[in-house]
């Protein structure tokens, strides 16, 4: 439950333009996913942190996080998340993922 709460709160902060706080909570969400072995929201938390890092001007970290989220979505066959990541990565960083 904690990863879901952290993901949702990080998403709200991201949408409000509070990128540093959003990135920190998304990272906390990732840590909670790993700590408790609940990986369902791990790609989402990675995606939120990637978007926040982009808007904070940290393109290298953002790029790495988008790649991690993309491949995790592919592994778990989370197609909705995959499409979001492909769209954002292309729009923000000009990354073209191949299928």
Protein language model features and the residues they cover:
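Tetratricopeptide repeat
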Residues: 22, 26-29, 62, 66-69
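"A position-specific structural signal for the A-helix of alpha-solenoid helical repeats
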Residues: 1, 8, 41, 48, ...
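Short coil/turn linkers that connect adjacent helices within long alpha-helical scaffolds
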Residues: 32-40, 72-80
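Residue register of alpha-helical TPR repeats
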Residues: 4, 44, 51, 64, ...
